[in-house]
Amino acid sequence: FTDMTISGKTFAILSILWKVFLVVIIMHLICITIQFLVAGTVSKKNPFTLIKNQIPGYTTALGTQSSAATIPVNLECAKNDGVCEQIRNFVVPLCANIHMAGSMITITACATAVCLMNQLPISLGTVVPFIMTLGVAMVASPGAPGGSIMTALPFLYMVFGAEAGDPDGAICAIMVALYITQDSFGTACNVSGDNA
């Protein structure tokens, strides 16, 4: 970050990053909407009522950045949706640790943006294996603030290449910073999907 400031690139990079941030949040909202539309169709319930019932869980996740801390509120949201006690007590805690759709969206979008900003080569041939590997790795991601990006760090070399993908390097530091700035929204997407 010091190098960016000295070279005068700070504002140029920030002008790109806020656009990435906006696109990621829109993608989260689309993901949540699709999940609740499918859930509403399958359960024959109004998906917009289901989304409305999820607002306390969403806002709790925004404030805590933690899927684990949102479990009690999410259980109450599932109760309001009419989910039976046995199912909600099994699914909500399980999904708090393994359902990371918001984190996947964010990490993939941020990795793509960082590649484009640094003129690193990017193609479907690099992104698809990364997404598949990340999908498996996210199962081990802790439900704590920043847990998903820390889980993803060892796999970023798949997108950035061996030199740029060094977990101690500047590009990975930018990835961590970019991810942490929106971690609240990614967590909110994760926990909202748990109740869809």
Named regions from a protein language model:
Residues F1-S7, Q35-K44, V159-A162:
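Structural signal for alpha-helical transmembrane segments and their membrane-water exit/capping regions
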Residues F1-S15, P47, M117-P121:
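Transmembrane helix-loop junctions in multi-pass membrane proteins
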